[in-house]
Amino acid sequence: MARILGTCSTAILASRPLSFPTSKSSVLSLPSTPGQSHGRKFYGGIGIPAKKGRSQFHVAVTNVATEISPAEQAQKLASKESQRPVYPFSAVVGQDEMKLCLLLNVIDPKIGGVMIMGDRGTGKSTIVRSLVDLLPQIQVVAGDPFNSDPEDPESMGMEVRESILKGDKLPVMTTKINMVDLPLGATEDRVCGTIDIEKALTEGVKAFEPGLLAKANRGILYVDEVNLLDDHLVDVLLDSAASGWNTVEREGISISHPARFILIGSGNPEEGELRPQLLDRFGMHAQVGTVRDAELRVKIVEERARFDKNPKEFRDSYKAEQEKLQQQIGSARSSLGSVEIDHDLRVKISKVCAELNVDGLRGDIVTNRAAKALAALKGRDKVTPEDIATVIPNCLRHRLRKDPLESIDSGLLVIEKFYEVFS
């Protein structure tokens, strides 16, 4: 299965025009007719000339003389890698369940993230951070702290949308998807962002300093030891991940911005569990155990020693595998929309959920999405029962009601019920 497999500190002033560096890459503009409001669709209170939402919200992109060349971008990426070398994802030995859950979330972010629970020292953080090399590139408005999508109004900050509607030309650049680490001791203001009340009162402007949720928009937010995080912060993260927006309210002043990200949490069950209500908000759940096979343990130790001795040489030895997996992910993301799942299989998935007494419909929805993402990863356009069998334990095990008298693993209960229904 292993083979198938910066936050800006400058305050944003809503009442002042935005200025973006024109030395980045491309320029986008949205032609508009002054005084004409007919045929507009409204996103967040701003009318957008369109007939059917995003499909009509395409912008004209033109190159400028100071465009950053691909070679310069590659050089910048290489310099970042040299500062902090990351262990290659394809070099990880074992932990196939966890790796598959991560890949499926990258292919379809709407799965809803993944919660990883396992013993200490099993490579949870290493594997999550190794995902950085496989993340695809996206187009963003240069200089925008929210990583606004130049073609999707639902992923734009308010100022960018206003500027586009005015006909302003904004620079566009291509960058890799962000992975943002949330420190365990982070405050709510650091996570959500802060409003400068003094400036609001004295100057009459909304001065907002974006937090980690703004930086994670259209990217990945990773929380290590999420089970030790304050419950109210976990609630904030899960609400933002589900709604795709973050709202900050202080002293009667309210500011909202897009916050669409993949939430990845990890933790050690010995240090405490998450509340069932919070667990249910994670799309998938992966259990990571200590490798017991002596030969595999030796291989892991040897590979780690090679990496520590010469990270660049070690990464180069896995370059071909990394590129192959990256292409596979890109192809799966492109073909995901054409993957189909038969109605009969949908009915059986829902029957499994119903007979396991799974509360709500999140389990049904996530299982359908994960099965389609797996089919896309394998290069198929149709979901098979085998795809469902692979993902359904990770989609449902954390949604089952806990029975203190039940000794069997919840994942095994899901598998038993699957074969009972699908046979």
What are the residue ranges of the model-derived segments?
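Peripheral, non-AAA+ core regions of ATP-driven protein-machinery
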Residues: 2-6, 13-21, 54-68, 86-87, ...
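Conserved ASCE/P-loop NTPase catalytic core
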Residues: 3, 44, 58-65, 69, ...
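Non-catalytic, well-ordered alpha-helical scaffold segments
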Residues: 100, 125, 235, 276, ...
